[in-house]
């Protein structure tokens, strides 16, 4: 297998459909056109032609599109054959194309990878293609499209350019120490560095919003049996996702629901009631519940308001609180307010949010929705926002750390050489986002998660 091979793959989802598309990219795409179509179509024009087998019989007929490189998605010669979407027809056409020497099936994401390697896209834009396909809401799709059009990359490139100018200034100060003006201590470098840090902080804030929009928040509902966990899951989901009975231990496995709150993806997980297991099946369910709790972004500690007047989680169930991960945020949810007559709404107890509601009637559930949105700092007015991945956040955080360390070196010891090194490392972190500086292993992991025909 060679990166110089001509590749082919189905660009439409498998299964039956009105249209099925095969995409070919590479130097032999021209030969495929002449062999299967009998001619080379006019560049960038839709040509209605028969698709022929080796013996001249017609396999299908449809639209052929010819994009000579470098003016194509991949930067190579690209041919698209748009025929009928029957799997048998597409398979016959694919087999016909693969009889031509030098062609092979594309790896997942290989078309996008070639576009990146041929400078048609940077890495953040290439990732945005997969994010656009996987978008689960209108807002996520719009933000992914912004990233694909270069909004995120432009912000990162602006930071890289600013760091380049700053590095030049710092290197000049190091190389010419005998000048009358001490460039390291005259305040100009510090001012420029502060500007870059402020710009980076703004991009980090937007990237966190973009990551929330892409990744969502994982919320686990946990508590004792019959506290109303499944009823709350149903209330948040807006449908009967979980079976609800008065029998303790009805939920024995993990139940998952994916919803949106004003565009923010929310992964709600209902777990088995936590208690001493009565049998092996329940024991496994409780074990899985704890696994989900340990991986959660937030835990909704569900309390049956008819069983206790306490509101402090450490008082209600100290053993449960003691077992939770140290920095895991907790929201105490006192359920069954329709029975206890408690005042609906949100308050605070010992640093934890406390919400009183009725999962059965739905009263107070909107308060919980707003709380979840606010607790993650999600901004519903993300005009012009972009999507971000965890690796992007890590690169931005590392760049910010290097800039802060560089500032400390500048102000503490006027150490120009150390500042210059921190600036270089910050620039390297930012360049990883767009792929200007990255490893082959990282590229392999990113593009292998794409669709075959992308």
Curated annotation (Swiss-Prot):
Protein function? Exhibits a very high intrinsic GTPase hydrolysis rate. Involved in the addition of a carboxymethylaminomethyl (cmnm) group at the wobble position (U34) of certain tRNAs, forming tRNA-cmnm(5)s(2)U34.
Q: What is this protein called?
A: tRNA modification GTPase MnmE
Provide the cofactor note recorded for this chain's UniProt entry: Binds 1 potassium ion per subunit.
Organism lineage reads as:
Bacteria, Pseudomonadati, Pseudomonadota, Gammaproteobacteria, Enterobacterales
Q: Which SUPFAM superfamilies match?
A: P-loop containing nucleoside triphosphate hydrolases, TrmE connector domain
CC cofactor? K(+)
Indicate the quaternary assembly. Homodimer. Heterotetramer of two MnmE and two MnmG subunits.
The UniProt entry's GO CC annotations, sorted and at most eight, read: cytosol
């Amino acid at each position: 297998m060679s990166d110089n091979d001509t590749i082919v793959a189905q660009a439409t989802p498998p299964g039956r459909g009105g249209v099925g598309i095969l995409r070919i990219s590479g130097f032999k795409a021209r030969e495929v056109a002449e062999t299967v179509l009998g001619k080379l179509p006019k560049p960038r024009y839709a040509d209605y032609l028969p698709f022929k087998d080796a013996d001249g019989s017609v396999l299908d007929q449809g639209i052929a599109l010819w994009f000579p490189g470098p003016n194509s998605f991949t930067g190579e010669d690209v041919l698209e054959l748009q025929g009928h979407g029957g799997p048998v027809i597409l398979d016959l056409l694919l087999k016909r194309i693969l009889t031509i020497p030098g062609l092979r099936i594309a790896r997942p994401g290989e078309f996008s990878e070639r576009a990146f390697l041929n400078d048609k896209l940077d890495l953040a834009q290439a990732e945005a293609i997969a994010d656009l396909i996987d978008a689960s809401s209108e807002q996520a799709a719009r933000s992914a499209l912004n990233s694909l059009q270069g909004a995120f990359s432009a912000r990162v490139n602006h930071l890289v350019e600013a760091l380049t100018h700053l590095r030049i200034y710092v290197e000049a100060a190091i190389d010419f120490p005998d000048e009358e003006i001490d460039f390291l201590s005259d305040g100009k470098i510090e001012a420029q560095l502060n500007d870059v840090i402020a710009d980076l902080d703004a991009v980090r804030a937007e990237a966190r919003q973009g990551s929330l929009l892409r990744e969502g928040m994982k919320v686990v509902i946990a508590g004792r049996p019959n506290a109303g966990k499944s009823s709350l899951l149903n209330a948040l989901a807006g449908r009967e996702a979980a079976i609800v009975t008065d029998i303790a231990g009805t939920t024995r496995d993990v139940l998952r629901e994916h919803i949106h709150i004003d565009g923010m993806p929310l992964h709600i997980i209902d777990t088995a009631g936590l208690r001493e297991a009565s049998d092996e099946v329940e024991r496994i369910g409780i074990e899985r519940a704890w696994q989900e709790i340990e991986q959660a972004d937030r835990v909704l500690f569900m309390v049956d308001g008819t069983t206790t007047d306490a509101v402090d989680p450490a008082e209600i169930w100290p053993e449960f609180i003691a077992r939770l991960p140290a920095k895991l945020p907790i929201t105490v949810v006192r359920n069954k307010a329709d029975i206890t007559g408690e005042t609906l709404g949100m308050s605070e107890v010992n640093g934890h949010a406390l919400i009183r509601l009725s999962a059965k009637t739905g009263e107070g559930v909107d308060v919980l929705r707003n709380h979840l949105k606010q607790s993650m700092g999600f901004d519903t007015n993300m005009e012009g926002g972009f999507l971000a991945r965890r690796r992007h956040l890590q690169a931005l955080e590392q760049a910010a750390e290097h800039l802060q360390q560089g500032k400390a070196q500048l102000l503490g010891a006027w150490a120009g050489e150390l500042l210059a090194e921190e600036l270089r490392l910050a620039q390297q972190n930012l360049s990883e986002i767009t792929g200007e500086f990255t490893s082959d292993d990282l590229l392999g992991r990113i593009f292998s998660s794409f669709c075959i025909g992308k």
